[in-house]
């Protein structure tokens, strides 16, 4: 009987962790890992345009944060970072996680919780 109750509690705990998912935290902001993963797709769409500009006028490049934040496909959960003065830096850190989200899923990054 006790083993059955313990098994059910463990199963419920595992389900709770899976439902909540992995959270990425940067300072006072926290984001679902799934939203962070979407940055990679947005960035890949934007890369060809940025690469062509880099060849001709590397000094004229605009910050990436306003461009990403203005896209309609930008994840809603990440919108609060667009208001931050250091949004560019935050996006760079989140994009590093988005490039290899598996390391976050196993909590290799200190910023990832909920594994």
Swiss-Prot record:
GO cellular component: extracellular region
Signal peptide span: 1-21
Gene3D superfamilies: Guanylin (3.90.1450.10)
Disulfide bridge positions per record: 69-82, 104-112, 107-115
Residues of the propeptide: 22-100
GO molecular function terms noted in the UniProt entry: guanylate cyclase activator activity
Location within or outside the cell: Secreted
SUPFAM superfamilies the record matches: Proguanylin
Alphabetically ordered keywords of this record: Disulfide bond, Secreted, Signal
Pfam families (alphabetical): Guanylin
UniProt record similarity statement: Belongs to the guanylin family.
Task of the protein: Endogenous activator of intestinal guanylate cyclase. It stimulates this enzyme through the same receptor binding region as the heat-stable enterotoxins.
Name used for this protein in its record: Guanylin
